[in-house]
Design a protein with these regions (language model features):
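Terminal-proximal interaction/regulatory segments of ATP-powered molecular machines
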Residues: 274-333
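Single conserved hydrophobic/aromatic residue that forms the stacking wall/gate
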Residues: 334-345
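Pre-Walker A (Motif I) flank of P-loop NTPase domains
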Residues: 29-33, 68
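Short acidic, hydrophobic short linear motifs in intrinsically disordered regions
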Residues: 264-275
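Phosphate-binding/switch region of NTP-binding enzymes
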Residues: 34-36, 40, 44-45, 73, ...
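Conserved inter-motif catalytic segment of the P-loop NTP-binding fold
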Residues: 2-4, 10, 17-19, 23-24, ...
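Hydrophobic positions on the alpha1 helix immediately C-terminal to the Walker A/P-loop
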Residues: 46, 50
Length: 345
C-alpha cells in the first residue's frame, strides 16, 4: 500500500507554491471545467472560437490567452461540419488546432488516447471534449458515484499535465434560482470540476444569452453575450464585486451623498428619512439596511453606523470618518457628541 504523502503547515505557510494558471486570463483555469448549456444554444460555436484563440494566442473578448496546441474532440460532428464552421469564423487557422470526431469511451481507453496525443504535442494547453455523454458508458452504479468517477478520471488527467480540459455538457429544463443546479446529472459532476460554466438564454429565439461562471480559483462572474454572424460577442462582463454592488439599495447611495458635508448625524430612522427627503422607504427597512451594509458598503464609504435604544426611543448615529478624501488620514471614528449605548442585534 502506498504511503500517504503529507505536507506540514509550516512548509505550506512559507514555501512558495505555483498558483493555478489560466488558459484564458481570469476565465478558464488549468484543470477540469464543465461547460453546460441547452441543446442547440451555440455551445460548439463558442468552443471553436475559444480553440482558435488559444491556438493562435489571440485574446478572447479582450482577455489574454496562453498560446499552445489545442485538441477539440467534436464527437457529435463531422469534419465537413467543422470545416463549414471554420469558413464562417476565420480566414486563417493555426496548425496548432487539432480535431477528432471519434474517440474511445472513458471506460475503454480515452485517457490512454489523450496521453498518446500529448506525447506528440507536449505543448498542448487546451483539450475540449464535446460532449461528455459521448465518452461515457451506461452504468448500473449509483448515479452520484458514476458521475464523480467519470469526471474524476478527466480531472486527474488534466491535473497531471497542468492543462485545461473543458467538458461540454447539457442542462436540464427546469426552473431554479441557482443556474448551476440545472446542470444535468448529480452534484458529482459540478463537485469534481474546478470551474463550471452555464450558458443560458431567457428565450429560445433570443440572440443574447448569459454565461455564468463559478469555480475554485475562478471568482463568480456573469457575461452577457450576443450571437451574431456565428460568433458569441461580449456585451457586458460583471464581476462578483460589481454584482454585489447592484444589490445595494439605492437609498444607501443617497445616504452617502447626504453625509458628504456632515461629520455626524443623530436621530431616529423617521427623522433620517425626513432629512434625506425620502418617501418610498419605511423606517424599519432603512434601519435593517444600515445594519446589513454597515461593515461593507457604509464602511467602504467611510461612514460609521451605531444603533441604540434610549428612554425616548431608538436612535441612529452616523459619523463620517476622517480621511474621507482618500488621503490615507486617520480613520478613527469622529466623536459622536450625544452618548449612545450600542446594543447587540
Amino acid at each position: 500500500m502506498q504511503k500517504l504523502q503529507t505536507v506540514n503547515a509550516e512548509t505550506l505557510l512559507y514555501e512558495p507554491l505555483e498558483k493555478p494558471s489560466f488558459v484564458v486570463d481570469s476565465l478558464i483555469p488549468t484543470g477540469l471545467s464543465l461547460f453546460c448549456g441547452s441543446q442547440k444554444i451555440g455551445k460548439s460555436w463558442l468552443m471553436l472560437k475559444l480553440c482558435l484563440c488559444v491556438s493562435q494566442g489571440i485574446p478572447l473578448w479582450d482577455m489574454p490567452t496562453m498560446e499552445g496546441d489545442v485538441l477539440y474532440l467534436c464527437l457529435e460532428d463531422t469534419f465537413c461540419r467543422i470545416q463549414d464552421r471554420l469558413f464562417r469564423l476565420t480566414d486563417e487557422a493555426s496548425g496548432r488546432l487539432h480535431f477528432a470526431v471519434a474517440s474511445c469511451k472513458l471506460s475503454d481507453g480515452l485517457i490512454v488516447q489523450l496521453e498518446d496525443y500529448l506525447k506528440d504535442y507536449p505543448d498542448s494547453r487546451l483539450i475540449v471534449i464535446d460532449t461528455l455523454q459521448k465518452v461515457r458508458t451506461a452504468s448500473k452504479d449509483n448515479a452520484y458515484a458514476s458521475d464523480y468517477g467519470d469526471i474524476s478520471l478527466i480531472k486527474d488527467f488534466a491535473d497531471r499535465h497542468s492543462l485545461a480540459v473543458i467538458v461540454v455538457h447539457h442542462i436540464r429544463k427546469q426552473n431554479d434560482s441557482d443556474v448551476f443546479n440545472k446542470v444535468s446529472g448529480t452534484t458529482g459532476l459540478t463537485g469534481s470540476a474546478d470551474a463550471t460554466f452555464v450558458l443560458e438564454k431567457e428565450k429560445r429565439a433570443s440572440d443574447t444569452a448569459k454565461l455564468y461562471v463559478t469555480g475554485r480559483d475562478t471568482p463568480y462572474q456573469e457575461y452577457t453575450l450576443r450571437f451574431r454572424d456565428c460568433r458569441w460577442e461580449l456585451v457586458e462582463r460583471k464581476t462578483q464585486e460589481q454584482l454585489a454592488k447592484e444589490t445595494i439599495p439605492d437609498v444607501l447611495f443617497r445616504l452617502v451623498d447626504f453625509m458628504r458635508d456632515k461629520e455626524e448625524w443623530i436621530g431616529t430612522a423617521t427623522e433620517l428619512l425626513a432629512a434625506m427627503g425620502e418617501t418610498e422607504t419605511i423606517p424599519t427597512v432603512i434601519t435593517k439596511w444600515l445594519n446589513e451594509y454597515r461593515t461593507t458598503f457604509l464602511s467602504e464609504n467611510r461612514i460609521c453606523y451605531q444603533y441604540s435604544r434610549r428612554k425616548d426611543g431608538r436612535r441612529i448615529a452616523l459619523a463620517r470618518r476622517a480621511g474621507d478624501s482618500g488621503d490615507g488620514g486617520d480613520l478613527s471614528l469622529i466623536h459622536i457628541s450625544e452618548p449612545t449605548r450600542p446594543i447587540s442585534i
